[in-house]
C-alpha cells in the first residue's frame, strides 16, 4: 500500500502536466481527422513517448526521476492497486498532501504559465508542441480508460490490451488526484485567469477559425484512440457536484465493482479539470451527441434507454429533493461551443456558454459528416449485446456522470438537437419519464409539437439562435413540475419581466461574469415564458375568430336591411365569405327593382347629364370624325327599324291595305320566305296587327293587340316559311319554354313567351311587348357617348341574371348583342331575346361564324371547343358599347377580330392556340400570329407575322374618354374597367364566371 502511495505521488506531476497539455491542444482544436479508429494502440504508445519527450520542458524534480523508474512496474501492479485503492484514498494524510502541494506548486505554475504563453504566441494554429495543459489532459484521458472499457470493446474488441494500459493510467490518476486536490484548485484558478486572457485575445480567431479547429481537434482526439475519448468523456461528466455524486453513487453502488470507487476521487479533481479544459466538454458532448443524434442509433439504443430510464427516475426523485435541476441523460448532448465557459464552478448553474449563437450552429453543421460516419460504426458495435450486468454497470456510471452535465446544460442558451431526438425516442418507448411531465407535453401547441419531427431536427441557425428559450423548454420539465407549484407567484412575474427586457441578457458573448442565480429560477423563467407564449397565441386566435364571426354577422344583418323588398335567408349576404348563388341573385334582383322604381322617368335625363360631362370641343371633334366612318347601323340597312312606315318598307309594298291589292291575298310569303305583313290584319283570330317592328334573319316581328285579353299588347314573331327556318323556330320555341318554366317569377330577364300558333304555314311566337332594343336606345340617346353609368350597371346586372338562367338550363344563347336585348318603355328593365341561334351546351358545333362578328369570342374564331364563356364575352363587348356608344372590336374579318382582341389583352396563349381547329388560318407553325390586312395602295392582302403582340389599347382611357367625372362615377368606371378586364380574357378558362361577375364590386356597390 505504501508503495502504491509513493508511486502515485511521484506520478502525479507528470499526469497533471499531461492533462494540461492535452486540454490546451483540445482547446486550440487542432487534431487531424482522417486517422482511423483502429490505430488507437499505436497512438497510446506515442502518447507515452510524448509524455517523456516533453518532460524536458517541464520540472525535472526528484519525484519525476523516481516516477520514471517506477513507471515500468505499473502494469504488474495495477491489479493489486484496484483492490487496495479504496483504502488508499482514506489513508492519505493531509500532511503529505500539503507538503507535496508546497513542493511543486510554484515551479509548476511558473512553467505552465510560460508554456501557455508560448503556445498562444507561436503554436496557436499548428498545435505541434504539446503544452502542459495537453499533458494533463492526456493523463486524464488515460486515467479514464478503464471505465470506458466497454465502449472500447464495442469499437474494436481489443479489450485485453486496453485494460492493462487503462488500469495503469487510472491508478496513476487516482492517487495522483487524491494528493493534489489543493494544487489542482489553485492551478485551475491560475489557468482560469489565463484562459480568460486568452479568450479575449483569441475571440476573433475562434469565431472565424472554429470550423477548422474543431474538425482538427476531432481528428486528433480520434487518432489518440476512440476508447480513451469515450472513456474520458464518460467519466468527466460524472462530477459536477460532490453531494449529487455521492448520493447517486450510494444508489448505484450495489451494481458496481470496487474499482468504481475510484470514480469518487477522480470526480473531485475532474470537476476542477473541467474548469481547466472547456473543450474537453466539447469533445465529450460531441461524442455523446453521436449516440443520440442519429435516428438509426436511437432505434438501436431504445432498449438500453428503457432500462436506463427506471434508474434515472429514482435518481431524479432524489435530486429533485435537493432542488438541483436534472434533465434526462439525453439532454446533456450539447455540442461545440456550448460548453466553453472556462470559469465555471461545479456549484453554479452557468447561464450561458456560447461565444455567440451563430458559431455554435456552424460547429454543428461542420461536424455532421464525420459524426454520421462514427455513428454508423457505433450502431453496429457489439456493445449493444453486452451482458446485462456489464451494461447495467456502464449505464449507472454513465448516468451518474450525466447528472452534472444536465445541470450544466440547463442554461437557456443551449438546446442541442439530440435533446429533441432522444425525447422523441423516449416517448416512443413509453418510459416513465413521460409520466413526469404530462401537463408540459399537453400544453404544447401543435406547431411546437411539430418541431420535434426528425425533419425539424436541423433547424436553421437563425431560428435556433433567435429563440434560445424555446430550445430547451422540454429539457427541464421533470424537476420543474414540483418546484413550479411552490415558487410560481412572484418569481414568475419577476422572471417574465426579465426575459422581456433582454433575451440574450445572460450570454457570455458580452464578456460578462456569470451571475450566481439558482438554476431552478432559470428553469422557471424559461418555462413561464413558453407557457405565456402559448397562452397568448391561443388568446390571440380566439379573438381573431370572434372578430371574424362578428364581422360576418354584421354584414349579414346589413345586407338584409338593405334589401327590404326581397326576402332573403338570415345568413344571406353577397358580402359574406361564401354567399350562396341564390342570395347573390336575390340581392341583384332587388337592386334591379329598386333601379326600376327610382328611374321610371329619369333615363333621358341621365343620358343628357352624361352628354353634359363631355367637353364641347371633344363633342365637335368626335362628330366630325364619325362622319368619315360609315355607320353599319344606319337606318337604310337597319333591319330593326322602329317604324313600319319607313321608305324601304313602303317601297316593298308592306303596309298597303288588302283592299287596294286583292292579288296579295294568296301571296302570303315573299321570295325569301318572309311573311308579308299587313297592318290591320288579325292573326289567329285574336291578334290585331297595328305595327311593324322589324325583320331578322329568321323572321319578321309585328306589334299586335290581343283581343282575347282586353287588347293587351303583344309582339308576334312570324318565322320565315322554309324548312330550315321552321326547324330553327321550333328549336327557339323549345328553349323559350324551358327558360320560362325555369323562371316562373320572371326574375332572370329572358323574354317571356306567351304562346305560339301557325298562321298561313308560318310558325308564330307570341311574346311580351317591349318597345326598343338597345341598339335603338344607343342610337336615339347615346350615339358616340353611351349611356349613364347607373343604367349600364343596372343593365349589366340584368344581363348576368339572364346568363345565370341560361346556364341553369344548359343553353348557349350564341348571339348576344345590343340588337337582341330589348328594353321596356321606361328603359329600366331589359330582356334577352332572339334565341334563334341558341343551342344546348353539349351540341356546340365548331363553326367560325357563330355569334355576330363584333361580339364573337376568340375561341370560336380559332375553332376551339366553347361553352358559356362565349356569351360572357358577348356581354362584355355589349357593356363596353353601352357605356361608350362605340363598338369594342369592330373587326372586318375573323383575323382582324383576333388582332383587335390581342391589341387589348396581349398575345393569345399558345396552349389555347394549339387546341384550335382553325389555328392555321391565323397562326403559323411557331404559333406566331399572321395578321392579314389589305394593302391600302395595292388593295391586295398582305400577311404580317407577329411573334409578340403587346397590349396597346387602354380600356380605361376609352371608357372615361373626355368626361369630367365626379368621384363616385369615376370609381364606378374603374370598377367597370376591372370587370371588363376579367370578362375579356382570351383564354375562356381564365374568364370570370357568372357567379364571380355577380359578386363583382361594380355589380354589388351602389353609386
Swiss-Prot record:
Mutagenesis or variant effect for residue 717 to R: Loss of kinase activity
Region (Disordered): 1-99, 140-533, 559-583
Modified residues (Phosphoserine): 8, 20, 23, 32, 87, 93, 131, 142, 144, 166, 239, 241, 257, 277, 283, 292, 294, 328, 354, 356, 366, 368, 387, 427, 431, 437, 518-520, 565, 569, 578, 580, 852
Cross-link annotation Glycyl lysine isopeptide (Lys-Gly) (interchain with G-Cter in SUMO1), location: 117
PROSITE patterns listed in its UniProt record: PROTEIN_KINASE_DOM, PROTEIN_KINASE_ST
Catalytic activity: L-seryl-[protein] + ATP = O-phospho-L-seryl-[protein] + ADP + H(+); L-threonyl-[protein] + ATP = O-phospho-L-threonyl-[protein] + ADP + H(+)
A GO BP entry: spliceosomal snRNP assembly
Record location of the Glycyl lysine isopeptide (Lys-Gly) (interchain with G-Cter in SUMO2) cross-link: 99, 111, 117, 170, 177, 593, 659
Location relative to the cell: Nucleus; Chromosome, Centromere, Kinetochore
UniProt KW keywords: Acetylation, ATP-binding, Centromere, Chromosome, Isopeptide bond, Kinase, Kinetochore, mRNA processing, mRNA splicing, Nucleotide-binding, Nucleus, Phosphoprotein, Serine/threonine-protein kinase, Spliceosome, Transferase, Ubl conjugation
EC number of this enzyme: 2.7.11.1
Stretches with biased composition (Polar residues): 1-10
Bias type Acidic residues, positions: 518-533
Classification via SUPFAM superfamilies: Protein kinase-like (PK-like)
Tissue: Ubiquitous.
Basic residues bias locations: 39-59, 67-81, 179-202, 214-230, 302-315, 342-367, 438-497
Assembly and oligomerization: Interacts with CLK1 C-terminus. Associates with the U5 snRNP and NCOR1 deacetylase complexes. Identified in the spliceosome C complex.
Name recorded for this polypeptide: Serine/threonine-protein kinase PRP4 homolog
Gene: PRP4K
Amino acid at each position: 500500500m505504501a508503495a502504491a502511495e509513493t508511486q502515485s505521488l511521484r506520478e502525479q506531476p507528470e499526469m497533471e502536466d499531461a492533462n494540461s497539455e492535452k486540454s490546451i491542444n483540445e482547446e486550440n482544436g487542432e487534431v487531424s481527422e482522417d486517422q482511423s479508429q483502429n490505430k488507437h494502440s499505436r497512438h497510446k504508445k506515442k502518447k507515452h513517448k510524448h509524455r517523456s519527450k516533453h518532460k524536458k520542458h517541464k520540472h525535472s524534480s526528484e519525484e519525476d526521476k523516481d516516477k520514471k523508474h517506477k513507471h515500468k512496474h505499473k502494469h504488474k501492479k495495477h491489479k493489486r492497486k484496484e483492490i487496495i485503492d479504496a483504502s488508499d484514498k482514506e489513508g492519505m494524510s493531509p500532511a503529505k498532501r500539503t507538503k507535496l502541494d508546497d513542493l511543486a506548486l510554484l515551479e509548476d505554475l511558473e512553467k505552465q504559465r510560460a508554456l501557455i504563453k508560448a503556445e498562444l504566441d507561436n503554436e496557436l494554429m499548428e498545435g505541434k508542441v504539446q503544452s502542459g495543459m495537453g499533458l494533463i489532459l492526456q493523463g486524464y484521458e488515460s486515467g479514464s480508460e478503464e471505465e470506458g472499457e466497454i465502449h472500447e470493446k464495442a469499437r474494436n474488441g481489443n479489450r485485453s490490451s486496453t485494460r492493462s494500459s487503462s488500469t495503469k493510467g487510472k491508478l496513476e490518476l487516482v492517487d495522483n488526484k487524491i494528493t493534489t486536490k489543493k494544487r489542482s484548485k489553485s492551478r485551475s484558478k491560475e489557468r482560469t485567469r489565463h484562459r480568460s486572457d486568452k479568450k479575449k485575445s483569441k475571440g476573433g480567431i475562434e469565431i472565424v477559425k472554429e470550423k477548422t479547429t474543431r474538425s482538427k481537434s476531432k481528428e486528433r482526439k480520434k487518432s489518440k484512440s476512440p476508447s480513451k475519448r469515450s472513456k474520458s468523456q464518460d467519466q468527466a461528466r460524472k462530477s459536477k457536484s460532490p453531494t449529487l455524486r455521492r448520493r447517486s453513487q450510494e444508489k448505484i453502488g450495489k451494481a458496481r465493482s470496487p474499482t468504481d470507487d475510484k470514480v469518487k476521487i477522480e470526480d473531485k479533481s475532474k470537476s476542477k479539470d473541467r474548469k481547466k479544459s472547456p473543450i474537453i466538454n466539447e469533445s465529450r458532448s460531441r461524442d455523446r451527441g453521436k449516440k443520440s443524434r442519429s435516428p438509426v442509433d436511437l432505434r438501436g439504443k431504445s432498449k438500453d434507454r428503457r432500462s436506463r430510464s427506471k434508474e434515472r427516475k429514482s435518481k431524479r426523485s432524489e435530486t429533485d429533493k435537493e432542488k438541483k435541476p436534472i434533465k434526462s441523460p439525453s439532454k446533456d448532448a450539447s455540442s461545440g461551443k456550448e460548453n466553453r465557459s472556462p470559469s465555471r464552478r461545479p456549484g453554479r448553474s452557468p447561464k450561458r456558454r456560447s461565444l455567440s449563437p451563430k458559431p455554435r450552429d456552424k460547429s454543428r453543421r461542420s461536424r455532421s459528416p464525420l459524426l454520421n460516419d462514427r455513428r454508423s460504426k457505433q450502431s453496429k458495435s457489439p456493445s449493444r449485446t453486452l451482458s446485462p450486468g456489464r451494461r447495467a454497470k456502464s449505464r449507472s456510471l454513465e448516468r451518474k456522470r450525466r447528472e452534472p452535465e444536465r445541470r450544466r446544460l440547463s442554461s437557456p442558451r443551449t438546446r442541442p438537437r439530440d435533446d429533441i431526438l432522444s425525447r422523441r425516442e423516449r416517448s416512443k418507448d413509453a418510459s416513465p419519464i413521460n409520466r413526469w411531465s404530462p401537463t408540459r407535453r399537453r400544453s404544447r401547441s401543435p406547431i411546437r409539437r411539430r418541431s420535434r419531427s426528425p425533419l425539424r431536427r436541423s433547424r436553421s441557425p437563425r431560428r435556433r439562435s433567435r429563440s434560445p428559450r424555446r430550445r430547451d423548454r422540454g429539457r427541464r420539465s421533470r424537476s420543474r413540475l414540483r418546484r413550479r407549484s411552490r415558487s410560481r407567484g412572484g418569481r414568475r412575474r419577476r422572471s417574465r419581466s426579465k426575459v422581456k427586457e433582454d433575451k440574450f441578457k445572460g450570454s457570455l458573448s458580452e464578456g460578462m461574469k456569470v451571475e450566481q442565480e439558482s438554476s431552478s429560477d432559470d428553469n422557471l423563467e424559461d418555462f413561464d415564458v413558453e407557457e405565456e407564449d402559448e397562452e397568448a397565441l391561443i388568446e390571440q386566435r380566439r379573438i381573431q375568430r370572434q372578430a371574424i364571426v362578428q364581422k360576418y354577422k354584421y354584414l349579414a344583418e346589413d345586407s338584409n336591411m338593405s334589401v327590404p323588398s326581397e326576402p332573403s335567408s338570415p345568413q344571406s349576404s353577397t358580402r359574406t365569405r361564401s354567399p350562396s348563388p341564390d342570395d347573390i341573385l336575390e340581392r341583384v334582383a332587388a337592386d334591379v327593382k329598386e333601379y326600376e322604381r327610382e328611374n321610371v322617368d329619369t333615363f333621358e335625363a341621365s343620358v343628357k347629364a352624361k352628354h353634359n360631362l363631355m367637353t364641347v370641343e371633344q363633342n365637335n371633334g368626335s362628330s366630325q370624325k364619325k362622319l368619315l366612318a360609315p355607320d353599319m347601323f344606319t337606318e337604310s340597312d337597319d333591319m330593326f327599324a322602329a317604324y313600319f312606315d319607313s321608305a324601304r318598307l313602303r317601297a316593298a309594298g308592306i303596309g298597303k291595305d288588302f283592299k287596294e291589292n286583292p292579288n296579295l291575298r294568296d301571296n302570303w310569303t315573299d321570295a325569301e320566305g318572309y311573311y308579308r305583313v299587313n297592318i290591320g290584319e288579325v292573326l289567329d283570330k285574336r291578334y290585331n296587327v297595328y305595327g311593324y317592328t322589324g325583320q331578322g334573319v329568321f323572321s319578321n316581328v309585328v306589334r299586335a293587340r290581343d283581343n282575347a285579353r282586353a287588347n293587351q299588347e303583344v309582339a308576334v314573331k312570324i318565322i320565315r316559311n322554309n324548312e330550315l327556318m321552321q326547324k330553327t323556330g321550333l328549336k327557339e320555341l323549345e328553349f323559350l319554354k324551358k327558360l320560362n318554366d325555369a323562371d316562373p317569377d320572371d326574375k332572370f330577364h329572358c323574354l317571356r313567351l306567351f304562346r305560339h300558333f301557325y298562321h298561313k304555314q308560318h310558325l308564330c311566337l307570341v311574346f311580351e311587348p317591349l318597345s326598343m332594343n338597345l341598339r335603338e336606345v344607343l342610337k336615339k340617346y347615346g350615339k358616340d357617348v353611351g349611356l349613364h353609368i347607373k343604367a349600364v350597371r343596372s343593365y349589366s346586372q340584368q344581363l348576368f341574371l339572364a346568363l345565370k338562367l341560361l346556364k341553369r338550363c344548359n343553353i348557349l344563347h350564341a348571339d348576344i348583342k345590343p340588337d337582341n336585348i330589348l328594353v321596356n318603355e321606361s328603359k329600366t328593365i331589359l330582356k334577352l331575346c332572339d334565341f334563334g341561334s341558341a343551342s344546348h351546351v353539349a351540341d356546340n358545333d365548331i363553326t367560325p361564324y357563330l355569334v355576330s362578328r363584333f361580339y364573337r369570342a376568340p375561341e370560336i374564331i380559332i375553332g376551339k371547343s366553347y361553352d358559356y364563356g362565349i356569351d360572357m364575352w358577348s356581354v362584355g363587348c355589349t357593356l363596353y358599347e353601352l357605356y361608350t356608344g362605340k363598338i369594342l372590336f369592330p373587326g372586318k374579318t375573323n383575323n382582324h377580330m383576333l388582332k383587335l382582341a390581342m391589341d387589348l389583352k396581349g398575345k393569345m396563349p399558345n396552349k389555347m392556340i394549339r387546341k384550335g381547329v382553325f389555328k392555321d388560318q391565323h397562326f403559323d407553325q411557331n404559333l406566331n400570329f399572321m395578321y392579314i390586312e389589305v394593302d391600302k395602295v395595292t388593295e391586295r392582302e398582305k400577311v404580317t407575322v407577329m411573334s409578340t403582340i403587346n397590349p396597346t389599347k387602354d380600356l380605361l382611357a376609352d371608357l372615361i374618354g373626355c368626361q369630367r367625372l365626379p368621384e363616385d362615377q369615376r370609381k364606378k368606371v374603374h370598377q367597370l374597367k376591372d370587370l371588363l378586364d376579367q370578362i375579356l380574357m382570351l383564354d375562356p378558362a381564365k374568364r370570370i364566371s357568372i357567379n364571380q361577375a355577380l359578386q363583382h364590386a361594380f355589380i354589388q356597390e351602389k353609386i
